[in-house]
């Protein structure tokens, strides 16, 4: 489903834990990381699409999370020319996304990247709130920044307010890597951080 302007309706999902960290997922077979996201099907509301994608991509159900906040407007990004499919009709030039901030209410052991026939991700870790804005592929960076700015005042842990604007980088240093096998950091700077902990 592509709109009149060439954008595909989509949802993006930021999953936070009680420490104020967010789930950062590694794309299957790649050294590329992003938040869970996916298209909205015909007849589906953004919230229904979010719950479907949440299960398909990370194995969580509506019982495992609670919605903290949903973005008020569509956020758009254009695809780079190298990713455009010029032969498709109508042609998709990018994504327009509704973003959801959800809090993980169940055990993180319920996270499962293999709930669909074609998994999107093969690893994940908890990172600090602003870390993904600096690390995501460049053409998604502006949308991530806008979504995270909108979510910043809603992020909290169980007992106290978390300040996502903090410059404390301890969350990245202590990032938990998870997958079937222990995940080794993909960048030299992450390797250095891991050895300092």
Curated annotation (Swiss-Prot):
Keywords: Hydrolase. A motif (Nudix box) lies at residues 38-59. SUPFAM superfamilies: Nudix (SSF55811). Its EC number is 3.6.1.-. Residues 6-149 form the Nudix hydrolase domain. It is an enzyme of class 3 (hydrolase). GO terms for cellular component: cytoplasm. It comes from the Bacteria. InterPro entries: Nudix_hydrolase, NUDIX_hydrolase-like_dom_sf, NUDIX_hydrolase_CS, NUDIX_hydrolase_dom, RppH. Transmembrane segments: none annotated. GO terms for molecular function: mRNA 5'-diphosphatase activity. Residues 165-197 are annotated as: Disordered. One of its GO terms (biological process) is mRNA catabolic process. Its cofactor is a divalent metal cation. NCBIfam families: PRK00714.1-1, PRK00714.1-4, PRK00714.1-5. Accelerates the degradation of transcripts by removing pyrophosphate from the 5'-end of triphosphorylated RNA, leading to a more labile monophosphorylated state that can stimulate subsequent ribonuclease cleavage. HAMAP family: Nudix_RppH. Belongs to the Nudix hydrolase family. RppH subfamily. This is RNA pyrophosphohydrolase. The gene is rppH.
